């Protein structure tokens, strides 16, 4: 049954995510009965032993595609930050629209939409609306600052492309490396990243030892290691700089 469930999950990755979800604290909208929550929860962001931020997320899927929503909150003394994002994907896992909003410390927002061979980002600086074009296909993966759940979506794409079905679940060749084109709307920059399967590892999280699948994510801005559990959900990320992200 586990294999069947995983194959359904990865089929959703090809048809990936139509996620319709509501950020934490927002008024819940009426949902289409055919929509299904694929993943939901929260991540703690740690610098050393100190928790510095929390991301709350939902991934939902329906016949029209997927929606990934996320809310990021950070409070360090008087410095408070609050942002939210919404990523909508078509059934073929192509970008329909991406929006992020900052409520604190300043109010700003940006939207990315496809336009033929371009992706167009519209963003505000002060009261001025700006526009920037990127010569990128709609298959480009959004990897924005602060929203770690988007790395799970990228991981599912990797699983679909690099791994195959086995009796015990999915088989991923160790050392198999794939490249993906990405866009970071916060930085208004694009880059290629690579993911490589690092094998199975025993990792202790919240005092409990688990056997997890390790992957290495590399890009121009730095390297991350991340771990997926047996349900192929992101449970841990660690940056070279020492930042760690843990599922609550």
PLM region descriptions:
Residues 38-39, 82-83, 196-197, 220-222:
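Short, small/polar residue-rich loop motifs at catalytic or cofactor-binding pockets
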Residues 36-38, 52, 105-211, 238:
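Solvent-exposed helix/loop surface patches that form functional interfaces
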Residues 8-19:
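Bacterial N-terminal signal peptides
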Residues 46-129, 232-238:
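N-terminal mature ectodomain segment of secretory-pathway/periplasmic proteins
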Residues 23-28:
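Boundary at the C-terminal end of the N-terminal hydrophobic targeting segment
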Residues 1-5:
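Positively charged n-region of N-terminal signal peptides that target proteins for export
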Residues 218, 224-241:
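Short, exposed beta-strand-loop hairpins at the edges of beta-sheets
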Residues 35-45:
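A short, Trp-centered hydrophobic/proline-enriched beta-strand micro-motif
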């Amino acid at each position: 049954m586990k294999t069947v469930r995983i194959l359904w999950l990865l089929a959703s990755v090809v048809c990936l995510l139509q996620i319709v979800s509501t950020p934490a604290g927002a008024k819940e909208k009426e949902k289409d009965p055919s929509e299904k929550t694929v993943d939901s929860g929260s991540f703690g962001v740690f610098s050393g032993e100190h928790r510095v931020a929390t991301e709350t997320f939902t991934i939902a899927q329906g016949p029209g595609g997927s929606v990934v929503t996320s809310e990021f909150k950070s409070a360090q003394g008087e410095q408070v930050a609050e942002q939210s994002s919404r990523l909508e994907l078509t059934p073929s896992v192509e970008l329909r629209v991406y929006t992020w909003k900052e409520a604190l410390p300043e109010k700003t927002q940006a939207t990315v939409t496809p336009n033929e061979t371009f992706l167009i980002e519209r963003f505000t600086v002060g009261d001025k609306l700006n526009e920037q074009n990127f010569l990128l296909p709609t298959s480009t993966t959004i990897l924005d600052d602060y929203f770690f759940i988007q790395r799970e979506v990228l991981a599912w794409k990797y699983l679909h492309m690099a791994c195959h079905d086995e009796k015990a679940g999915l088989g991923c060749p160790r050392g198999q490396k794939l490249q993906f084109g990405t866009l970071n709307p916060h930085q208004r920059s694009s880059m290629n990243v690579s993911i490589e399967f690092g094998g199975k590892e025993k990792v202790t999280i919240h005092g409990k030892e688990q056997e997890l699948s390790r992957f290495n994510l590399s890009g121009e801005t730095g390297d991350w290691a991340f771990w997926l559990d047996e349900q192929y959900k992101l449970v841990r990320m660690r940056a070279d700089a020492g930042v760690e992200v843990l599922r609550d």
